[in-house]
Amino acid sequence: MRLVEFYSEKKVCSYIDSKQSIFRYFHIQNVTPSFYYGLLERGWRRFGNYFFTPMCEGCTDCISIRTLIDDFTFSRNHKRLLKKAQNIDIYIQKPTITQAHIELYNRYHRVMRDKKGWEYTPTTPESYMDMFVEGHQDFGYEILYFIDSQLVGVGLVDALFDSITAVYFYYDHTFAHHSLGTLNILKQIQIGKENGLKYFYPGYWIKDHYCMGYKQRFTPFEVLKNIPDVFEAPIWEMYNG
């Protein structure tokens, strides 16, 4: 395992315009599942061979959370959505790249640029490989969603020991009425239940945020209370509102 540490440049936060963000990165070739799991427990996320965590000055709004899978109960609306999804073909496999992936990814981000002001640069096959295919090893998977043989959603996930963690999800907004984002989270929790997993990590949460607040709907969940370094113990506590 080879690790290179670096920091991003300070820039305007993608989620709170009045603040600036900076991230600590590890670039790790051939990461071991146990080392990755240790990072995950300490609030790190993964894209490709890159692992990162926010280190923003004077701000801790991005909170690492994890849903308790065994204690999660599917609501009536959740069950209705899962039943409705029986008409959607869902496949789980190792991460791949096709022209359909690239086109869907770029379509999704064009919409998000217009809808929420996201920065948009069309991805290339090389960039997509670097961020979503490389580094998946034995723990990385993609969940593919098809409607009438058309790729309409891609969920990248990692499964590590007792946990499943959402890496990224993008979808076709033409099919937004299928609530694909919520469906993708429910499928991951469902997979966790079926495989006896303990935690679902949905990524960073900003309470009541227009873009990041939705994660608080999947309860019960724990929050990471400290900002531990790599060899410091993480402190997780149940969130009570």
UniProtKB/Swiss-Prot annotation:
It is found in: Cytoplasm. It comes from the Bacteria. GO terms for molecular function: arginyl-tRNA--protein transferase activity; leucyl-tRNA--protein transferase activity. The keyword Cytoplasm applies. This is Aspartate/glutamate leucyltransferase. Belongs to the R-transferase family. Bpt subfamily. It catalyses: N-terminal L-glutamyl-[protein] + L-leucyl-tRNA(Leu) = N-terminal L-leucyl-L-glutamyl-[protein] + tRNA(Leu) + H(+); N-terminal L-aspartyl-[protein] + L-leucyl-tRNA(Leu) = N-terminal L-leucyl-L-aspartyl-[protein] + tRNA(Leu) + H(+). Functions in the N-end rule pathway of protein degradation where it conjugates Leu from its aminoacyl-tRNA to the N-termini of proteins containing an N-terminal aspartate or glutamate. SUPFAM superfamilies: Acyl-CoA N-acyltransferases (Nat). Keywords: Acyltransferase, Cytoplasm, Transferase. GO terms for biological process: ubiquitin-dependent protein catabolic process via the N-end rule pathway. Its EC number is 2.3.2.29. The keyword 4Fe-4S does not apply. It is an enzyme of class 2 (transferase). One of its GO terms (cellular component) is cytoplasm. Pfam families: ATE_C, ATE_N.
